[in-house]
């Protein structure tokens, strides 16, 4: 298929671009999120920051909970949860369990994508949520990630956002 595209582009003098090129271009000129604010809060396990981001496509709020200092040179532990938030996020069992398991790391980012659709049945919006999550992660100055997930992930296009998964840790 790719060979056919090369032939077609050469014949019609059309330039080809990769998915990463397209994502990089759109990220440079089109932001899908805007930061609302950052709040500090304390739990028994220490000081955390809650970053609130508006998703411009769905007009809802997504959250990032961070602990520690981030440095572009270092790899940051990142866990992404995709759920429907109906009340205070710090009363959500899934979020509290994730915070408890992440607390063993000095620096981490827990990204909470607040989905409007049913996470179990909708694959249509998955790429859009990846883009929104990637923009939030990039806004928080993370470049290199140690991704914590329930299964091995092969996420195409993150390079277009300037993000790299250096390592994956599978949890149950």
Predicted features along the sequence, with ranges:
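Catalytic domains of riboflavin
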Residues: 1-172
